């Protein structure tokens, strides 16, 4: 995890901010506010399907000297939906307004590092889902302080309920003074490439930021750094560290996702959750690179399955096939494409062994997901709950075979 040291003015203590969050402390206190004539505004705090509203610009919190003053300002200036022109609103306004009350900003702090991320409200009594890498500092969730700012501006301490590094998800909980607004989940198996989506979160600390785009691709598999690795950061792809990567099955979107969006919402045109933002691709080597229009989100159905497990038991279970696999290539040439997951070894007594899968078999499908490389099979299996029955299709000696297997 690449950390950027930032020294607070008036203090010898240095805080190392995870570059995932791209935060720098202000050099001095903000200037005294000048009195200005306040324009008349219409504010709405509740959205219905026929409401027409415009999202206002909300500034995120800064970290560093003067943080106490800024925090006080924020408690008196909560995020708000501002209506400026009822005749010029659109679906983005409607969708983001429906979902925004269910998106929170998360502050994480340890002894030597700190950062910000986003989260999605699961229940009215305070359960919130985010990325495991958001609640992890220096490769650990131990001794990490968590705070949550709600959509209406109140700040609450949070406790970690459980984390699932395998799917880069975690659940935290706050004790709020009033019921939270749970996010409405869409069925992520029903979305299409080309569907319009909105990303909501706190990129660079700018809370309640909304960006629009489309679903660029489905059933992608990416490799990201494990949240358990102190030398790697979240949001970015795996860079070849000593710990194995995490293989995630994700939705690809061109909605702008930046550091601080991690754990935030990707919603459809109805304001329903289709995914939790988790990673971005970048062109440069800098850890502070921003969006290039290639972002990724964990599908809502996976988020619900994992978060339900964590709330119920404090942990999440995963399917296990019981095979050692590698990519099956289309040819022996250097220009070959991967065409499936080649079984190198079968674990005796494991799920694959019980149904007769053999070394040399090539897995090409799991349920409705086509498998073209080993990482896709790994992510597909691990997204399933332990004990789930799935259908697997393999190639053996030129013939296709289909098996039902309990993971």
For each feature predicted by the language model, list its residue ranges:
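A conserved glycine-rich beta-strand in the N-terminal activation segment of trypsin-fold
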Residues: 49-50, 86-92, 107-129, 154-159, ...
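Interdomain regulatory linker/hinge segments that flank or connect interaction modules
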Residues: 65-83, 224-227, 277-328
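PDZ/PDZ-like groove recognition
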Residues: 115, 251-252, 256, 305, ...
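Active-site substrate-binding loop(s) of clan PA
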Residues: 159-161, 178-207, 214, 298, ...
């Amino acid at each position: 995890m690449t950390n950027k040291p930032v020294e607070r003015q008036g203090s010898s203590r240095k805080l190392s901010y995870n570059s995932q969050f791209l935060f720098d402390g202000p050099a001095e206190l903000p200037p005294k506010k000048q009195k200005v004539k306040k324009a008349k505004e219409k504010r709405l705090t509740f959205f219905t399907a026929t409401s027409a509203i415009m999202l206002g610009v909300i500034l995120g919190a800064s970290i560093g000297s003067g943080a106490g003053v800024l925090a006080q300002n924020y408690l008196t200036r909560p995020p708000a939906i501002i209506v400026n022109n009822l005749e010029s609103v659109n679906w983005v306004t409607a969708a983001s307004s429906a979902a925004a009350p269910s998106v929170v900003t998360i502050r994480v702090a340890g002894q030597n590092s700190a950062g910000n991320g986003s989260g999605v409200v699961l229940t009215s009594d305070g359960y919130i889902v985010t990325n495991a890498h958001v609640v992890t500092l220096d490769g650990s969730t131990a001794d990490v302080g968590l705070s949550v700012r709600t959509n209406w501006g109140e700040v609450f301490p949070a406790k970690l309920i459980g984390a699932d590094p395998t799917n880069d998800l975690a659940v935290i909980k706050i004790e709020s003074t009033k019921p939270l607004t749970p996010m409405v989940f869409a069925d992520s198996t029903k979305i299409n490439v080309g569907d319009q989506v909105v990303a909501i979160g706190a990129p660079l600390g700018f809370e309640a930021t909304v960006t629009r785009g489309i679903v660029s691709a489905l059933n992608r598999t990416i490799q990201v750094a494990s949240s358990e690795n102190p030398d790697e950061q979240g949001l970015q792809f795996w860079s070849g560290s000593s710990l194995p990567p995490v293989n995630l099955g994700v939705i690809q979107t061109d909605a702008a996702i930046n550091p601080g969006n991690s754990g935030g919402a990707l919603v459809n045109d109805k304001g329903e959750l289709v995914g939790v933002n988790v990673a971005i691709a970048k062109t440069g080597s800098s850890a502070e690179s921003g969006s290039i229009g290639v972002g990724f989100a964990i599908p809502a159905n996976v988020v619900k399955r994992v978060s339900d497990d964590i709330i119920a038991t404090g942990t999440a279970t995963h399917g296990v096939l019981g095979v050692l696999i590698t990519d099956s290539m289309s040819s022996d040439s250097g220009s070959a494409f991967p065409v499936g997951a080649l079984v190198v070894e079968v674990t005796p007594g494991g799920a694959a062994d019980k149904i007769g899968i053999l070394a040399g078999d090539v897995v090409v499908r799991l349920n409705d997901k086509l498998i073209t490389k080993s990482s896709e099979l790994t992510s597909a299996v691990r997204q399933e709950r332990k004990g789930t029955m799935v259908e697997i299709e393999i190639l053996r000696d030129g013939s296709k075979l289909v098996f039902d297997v309990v993971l």
